[in-house]
C-alpha cells in the first residue's frame, strides 16, 4: 500500500487537546471539594467522561492554580490516562513505571519500576466487595498482569506466576504471534476483565478475538470470535476457514459496559489487509461492527455492521456512548457510535433496533482484479459531521501558484468521494481519511441530557495500491516465510512495501551493497 497525506496546512479541521492536571486552590471556595473517584478509563464503564461537579464554572476557571507537580515523562509522548480511587492517583511515569501518588499532595506512595511495554493509554482498578483485595490490572507487552493497588507489588497468584499470555487461544501457534498487546486497558464487569487487542493489521497478524478473564485467577472465562468459526453466526460472510489466516478484526479502542443490563458493546476494527480484500471476499462479519454481548457469558445479543467488506480502514475507533433519548414521546435507552467516516448510528441498547433510520445506498465497484467491493453501504440519516470529497477549492490559498497547480493536477488525476475503492491505476483521495472523523478518544456524553459530544477532524489522505514483490523472487524458498513475517511485522510500515523507503526511512533494496553487515546489525 502506497500512502500519502496532504501537507499539514491542508488539514481542514484538526483539534488538539492538551491537558494539565490541576487541583483547585482551597481558598478559592468556601469549603474543601468533595472527593470524586475516577476509577475507570473514561470515568466509568460507560466511557462517558462525565462527572457531576459544580465548583469549576466559567466564572472561576481563570482562578485555577497548580497545586503540585509530578514529572511523568522522561522523553517522548505519554498518552496515559490516570485513574483516581479515594485519595490515590495511579499514573504511568519515570521510564515506564507505574506510580501511586497522593492526589491532594502529589507525594509518591509507591513505584513499580521498569514496566517496559506497559500499555501507554491506561489501566484498570478492581476491588472485592469487602475491599480487602484491591488490584490494578495492566497489560505489559503480550501479557496481562495484576498489581496490589495498596503496595505496588505484583500478585503472583494471578495467571501463571503473575502473568496471562494473551497470545494463547487465537487459532495460531502462540510462539508465532509477535504482537498481541492491547492498546487499551480493557473494561471491567463484576469480576471479569474484558480485553480487546492490537495484533496489527497487516498480513500474518493474529485475529482479534475478544476475551474475558477472571480478575482474581487470570482464568479465561469466555471468547468471542470476531472472525467466526465453522457453525458460528457470520461464518458464511467469509471464505472457508478464513479464521485460520485472516487477522485483525479486533477491538483496539474503548469498549463500553451497561452495568445494569450486563451488556458490553464492542467497536470492532477492520480485517487484514486494511485496503485490499480479494482474499476475504464477503461482508466479513464482525469486522467494522458494533457488537452487543452478554458481558458474563460472551454470547452475542445483536450486531450492526457500519462498513461492509472494509477497504478504507474505517474501523470503529470511538467509544460507544450510552444515552437516554426522548423519541416520539417515548424514552429509549440507546447506544450511539460515531464513525471515522463521519456518521452517527444510534440503536436500542437491548434489541439493536436503529433509533434513527439507516439506508443501504449503492457505491462504485472495485477495478482491482479479484476484488469484490460490497455494492451497498449503510448510511445514517442523521446529519453527517465531516465532508467526503476533496475539491480544488480546498487547497490552501496561501500556497504558491506552482504548489497549487501541482495539487490541482493531482486532484484531477485522482478519484475522491465516499467509499471509492483503492486502485493500482490511480490515486484515491479519502476524506475524512482513516485518521479522521471520530477516532480514538473523540466522543463523550452527558447521560442525563442525552447529549453526545464528538471531537472530529478531517485528514485528507492519498492512497494507491502497489503490487508487492514476492519474497520468492528475492530469496531462497526455505527462508521465504520467515523473512516475510519479519519484514511485515518489523520493517514494512517505515521502509515500504517493496523496501523502497518512505520519508526519513531509507530504502533497503540495495542495502547489502551499501552497508557492511556489522554496521547494519548495529
Region spans (language model):
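Long, low-complexity segments enriched in small/aliphatic residues
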Residues: 377, 381-449
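Post-cleavage N-terminal segment of exported redox proteins
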Residues: 11-25, 446-479
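Generic beta-strand/beta-sheet core signal
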Residues: 92, 139, 147, 196, ...
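Mature N-terminal segment immediately following signal peptide/propeptide cleavage
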Residues: 32-73
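Repeat-blade elements of multi-bladed beta-propeller folds
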Residues: 38-42, 77-95, 118-144, 178-202, ...
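Extracytoplasmic electron-transfer domains, predominantly the class I c-type cytochrome c fold
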Residues: 181, 263, 476-481, 485-522
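Extracytoplasmic/lumenal domain signature
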Residues: 59-73, 98-118, 130, 144-177, ...
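Short, solvent-exposed loop/turn elements at domain surfaces
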Residues: 45-51, 75-79, 99, 274-275
